[in-house]
Amino acid sequence: MPDAFTIRPAAPNDAQEVARIRVLGWRFAYQGLVPQGYLDSLSIAEDTERMCGYLSQLSQDAPPKSSAFGLNSGDSGKRSFMLAVRDDAVLGFCHFSAAPNNTDRVERATPGGTMNGRLHSLYIDPDALGQGIGHALMSHALSTFAAWGCERAHLWVLEGNSRAVSFYERQGWQLTGDTKVDRSFGVCLVEHEMTIQF
């Protein structure tokens, strides 16, 4: 049985490991769902540079300067980027936020702006799958959403990613039937929304 792992906030010096897991996670999870040329073009070095900048902003509690990691410029809500770590090795990460009316659909905004959460990403090193790391990171995110006063949270999952849908459903998330097309990564990807209530 593998040794225990801990969950802690990400810091700028974790950027390379986070980028490595993100790239490996994309190549593992999205093979056959995303054009192979795009997956092959993913660069740990380029992602490290972007991630270092984002984690630096996050550590200073500054609003994000771009939406490259799922938040809009000027977002004044709460953000968290947590790592699962064993013996200083990063095994996975979970990035989530909460804000009043934190929704991708303007028509869902409510008067008074109820606090809503959003799970932006959850990736595990493919070599560390099946060790409870994803469940632990998700449990941390859900308890944080509740502590922040969120009434609900949502995420988007790539069409055809049945492994992710099954994982999220086991954690209590449900498909809403809503879809969107994401072009932010240079390819057209259809995503399905999932939500959870608190």
State where each predicted segment sits.
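Basic/polar N-terminal segments that are highly enriched at the extreme N-terminus
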Residues: 1-2
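Acetyl-CoA-dependent GNAT
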Residues: 5, 9-12, 20-127, 135-140, ...
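C-terminal "cap" of GNAT-fold acetyltransferases
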Residues: 113-117, 151-154, 158-165, 169-198
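Active-site acidic-Proline motif in GNAT/NAT acetyltransferases
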Residues: 125-127, 131, 159-160
